[in-house]
């Protein structure tokens, strides 16, 4: 019997994320010397139905310290998992879910549970002398995702007047992931010059995800700026646009309307605005175009915005129960996968598989509060997701993921860059 995969030690600590807020880091060591560690991310605009991120609510770090979550790993989770075979990912995740005993992981904290879940997978992969993407995805993990790079920031990610949260570029015309990164990096620098020319050098400050946050006042102004940056870089034929509206952030529940550019807008009117944008600009994907509880509205938007990828983030929160409802109603046609929304690796994979089985595309995503941890890069390849969004080609916590994907592509030798096949990459 091979006991080298048995979990020997689990340890957690409080560290900082890219916004200067505390988060949980977990380390797992196996009897065979395999080592895995993970730093969990945190979102700024969060879905109401996400798994609970446990915070201490004390004076330290303005109430955001995570020492209780750290203690839950060191004093509760570790005691239950030491001696378990790290390869039994689903069993390990279920043990933690049962230990927590709540629907939303609010007892132990999704940040505690996820840190251990991912660190266990990494330790098992290291024990097996396999890269994480190959350990999770097997020999069929070969698709390099098309990156959605957030180069213009608004909403909760910036301090400007933009209602929409993310304006992204996706280099579908590249021949490889490395070339895709180059196209985006060159466009990013081109856009920087455009922003400086139009708004002054002081306007090239950046938001949480590395994108520029100039004093743009309207969505059309932002899209025109983006188009000019792409044209100057010379990639008008290779790069398309994707958006994250994060519409729940500018939805007024009292009136049942959206506040766009200071005016109240109905669901139908907002869908019409999207239609106009899609007709004028090379937009191929819109994330969270409507309020997170408006399944009917999502269904209508999916039908009326023909050919456009409608991505459910706050709508689904990587939860198979909500995803199942969306599938039955035809609400959106794509799942945004954020591991910390659901709290375990196995549940994240379940959501991805449900999406694929029902003809939905998949976008693996970071959060606005990130770290140098690059786990989602491996996960995107393991799942053959075809798409990843992890910020601008700037700031170390964003480039860590892109650099890891460059390494993976090099290591695979024979791989497929999703490119124009980003919706159905295999």
UniProtKB/Swiss-Prot annotation:
EC id: 4.2.1.11
InterPro entries: Enolase, Enolase-like_C_sf, Enolase-like_N, Enolase_C, Enolase_CS, Enolase_N
Active site residues of this protein: 209 (proton donor), 338 (proton acceptor)
Keyword Calcium: no
Protein's GO biological process: glycolytic process
Cofactor: Mg(2+)
PROSITE patterns (UniProt xref): ENOLASE
Gene name of the record: eno
Matches recorded under SUPFAM superfamilies: Enolase C-terminal domain-like (SSF51604), Enolase N-terminal domain-like (SSF54826)
Chain sites annotated for binding Mg(2+): 244, 287, 313
Recorded family membership: Belongs to the enolase family.
Subcellular localization(s) per the UniProt record: Cytoplasm; Secreted; Cell surface
Protein name: Enolase
Pathway: Carbohydrate degradation; glycolysis; pyruvate from D-glyceraldehyde 3-phosphate: step 4/5
Gene3D superfamilies: Enolase-like C-terminal domain, Enolase-like, N-terminal domain
Cofactor: record remark: Binds a second Mg(2+) ion via substrate during catalysis.
Keyword Chaperone listed: no
Organism: Methanococcus maripaludis (strain C5 / ATCC BAA-1333)
Function: Catalyzes the reversible conversion of 2-phosphoglycerate (2-PG) into phosphoenolpyruvate (PEP). It is essential for the degradation of carbohydrates via glycolysis.
One Gene Ontology term of the molecular function aspect: magnesium ion binding
Reaction(s) this enzyme catalyzes, per UniProt: (2R)-2-phosphoglycerate = phosphoenolpyruvate + H2O
Keywords per UniProt: Cytoplasm, Glycolysis, Lyase, Magnesium, Metal-binding, Secreted
One of the record's GO cellular component terms: cell surface
UniProt-annotated binding residues for (2R)-2-phosphoglycerate: 165, 338, 367-368, 389
